[in-house]
Swiss-Prot record:
Organism: Sicarius cf. damarensis (strain GJB-2008)
Segments crossing the lipid bilayer: none
The name this protein goes by in its record: Dermonecrotic toxin SdSicTox-betaIIB1bx
GO biological-process terms attached to the record: killing of cells of another organism; lipid catabolic process
Manner of cofactor binding, per the entry note: Binds 1 Mg(2+) ion per subunit.
């Protein structure tokens, strides 16, 4: 999976897909009451990127629904995964449950259209810290209460704050989540990051019977040398400001026979058995 990073403007979706991304990440900003308002990162962000692009969240969902709906004029077959970077650190932890309710309802109304949409992308909920786990509980409660629990099959969980992996496992146990879990490891593209935690996560992913990490991606990679390093370690995905660079690396002799781009037929919740 090649995740285009910080794709917050509607017009940038096609741009990142044209560069080779088959997944996009966008930031969701909330008001003080936990209501999702806009797709917006804000300052500071990655080196070499403008942080101010934005869109109204519901309008963004309306557009991305079309982009991921077969036979729609805007349909782009390659886009199979949407990563929602939830800016929960900007609101009180007490509002995390309200935020989860709101995002679930907006997805129901504007993306899935309560069963009337054929939009097919998988959804990855990126939670910054384990202390915000009530967002996940609320999201799942809302799908159940609204009568759409079946959409849980399309939704995965990911904690992005580089926290202790055992602490993350404990929270997933509290929530009763034993599948459909990604684990991110990374840092802003402005800095270098070691591989100790990434290697630990990969070891857990590959441990038989360990159900708290199904997939792993590294972020935010812009240097080809770091992309190569991550691929050698065996990541499932790379988040980048430059999807075209990832494409070029994947075509190199060392990787061409080992990796390919994920398609809709590849389940993002299953461990890869090579």
């Amino acid at each position: 999976w090649i995740m285009g990073h910080m794709v917050n403007a509607i017009e940038r979706v096609d741009e990142f897909l044209n560069l080779g991304a088959n997944a996009i990440e966008f930031d969701i900003d909330f008001d003080k009451d936990g209501i999702a308002q806009i797709t917006h990162h804000g300052i500071p962000c990655n080196c070499g990127r403008k942080c101010t692009k934005k869109a109204i969240f519901t309008e963004y969902l309306d557009n991305i629904r079309q982009v991921t709906t077969p036979d729609d004029p805007k349909f782009r077959e390659q886009l199979v995964l949407l990563a929602l970077d939830l800016k929960l650190l900007r609101i009180s932890s007490a509002k995390a449950y309200r935020a989860g309710e709101d995002v679930a309802k907006k997805l129901l109304d504007h993306y899935w259209q309560r069963g009337n949409s054929r939009a097919r992308a998988y959804i990855l909920l990126n939670i910054p810290l384990v202390e915000d786990y009530e967002f996940i509980r609320a999201f799942k409660d809302t799908l159940k209460n609204e009568g759409y629990e079946s959409y849980n099959d399309k939704v995965g969980i990911n904690f992005t704050g580089n926290e202790d992996l055992d602490k993350i496992r404990d929270v997933l146990e509290i929530l009763g989540i034993h599948k459909q879990v990604w684990q991110a490891d990374g840092i802003t593209s402005c800095f270098a990051r070691g591989t100790e935690r990434l290697k630990e996560a990969l070891e857990k992913r590959d441990t038989p019977g360990y159900n708290y990490i199904n997939k792993i991606y590294a972020w935010t990679l812009v240097r080809k040398s770091i992309m190569r390093r991550s691929l050698r370690l065996g990541v499932d995905g790379v988040m980048s400001n430059n999807p075209d660079r990832v494409i070029k690396v994947l075509k190199e002799k060392e990787f061409a026979d080992k990796f390919r781009l994920a398609t809709y037929n590849d389940n993002p919740w299953e461990k890869f058995r090579g």
